[in-house]
Amino acid sequence: MTLEELKKEIRPLDETSMEQAREHWIKIAKPLFSLGKLEDAVIQMAGIKETPDYELKKKALVIMCADNGIVEEGVTQTGQEVTAVVADNFTKSSTSVCAMSKVAGVDLFPVDIGMSVNVPSVTVKEEKVAYGTRNFSKEPAMTREEVWQAIEIGIRKVEQLKEQGYEMIATGEMGIGNTTTSSAVASVLLSVAPEQVTGRGAGLSSAGLEKKISVIKDAIANYQPDKEDPVDVLSKVGGLDIAGLTGVFLGGALYRVPVVIDGFISSVAALCAARMVPVSKSYFLPSHVSKEPAGAMLLEALELSPLLTCNMSLGEGTGAVAVIPVLEMGLSVYREMTTFEKAKIEQYEVLK
């Protein structure tokens, strides 16, 4: 699917369903607008699903797993072999997000979109673009064709999950070196200096952080990625996990499934999708604000406000999964609480 086709096919939210949801909130026997952002999210999802009467019975977490050639430059504390180990652990219910997903009732779908090795429990030939990206300190990370292939894989994953009955998709990632690629992409898209959006990732020393910033600065200076063209930016300094998640966000908009943003890497992908197809942003739900330097900046660029502020930076989709029970609680009030009329209480008026 081409970008022009996506722009043509992705439609705005259904205003009629949203208005019906707003009217129902007003009828519920509680102080008006007292659930704040939860009410807004329920209304937004009504617009996404084109009905004010919906449920969230099946929730999925798509975890894009990929390796990054830039780790050769010493910008990470650990080697890229860790990516494959953690990806395999997703299938064994032995990672942080696995434990959280059990509580939240979320099913995990790790995708090997670009790990440096095959992981039998995860790798599917049709979902793998490459065995890691190239080292962008020496050459562009990917070709445009590879970026588009990854985006299309993300879109197809949403289509498959919707066909399986999933009603909400959370986004996650695993890839050593992906805070470097995400910082590079964020620097370009936000038009800010690399040092303003680059953090220590999974625990870099001060010297390591300086190296990370230097590598990003040099790559941006060398390749001059076009901030008006996210595919160009991703191909030069991005990662396959970011590209795959960009596809998940676009797929959510295309197939009308709400997609939950996680943290830093996920927010970068969301911004890529929003820059490619602006209306797609209406289908994104924020979770938390990452403690990475660019976390708040990215949400601001997306014009979104986080529901959680937990000072998290773990990745894997942990923040996205954490917010799902909160959203479900808001929906439960919307669906189950009595109205003013049934409670025989005089309805509150919307005062101006």
What are these regions, as identified by a protein language model?
Residues 2-352:
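N-terminal loops that bind phosphate or other acidic moieties
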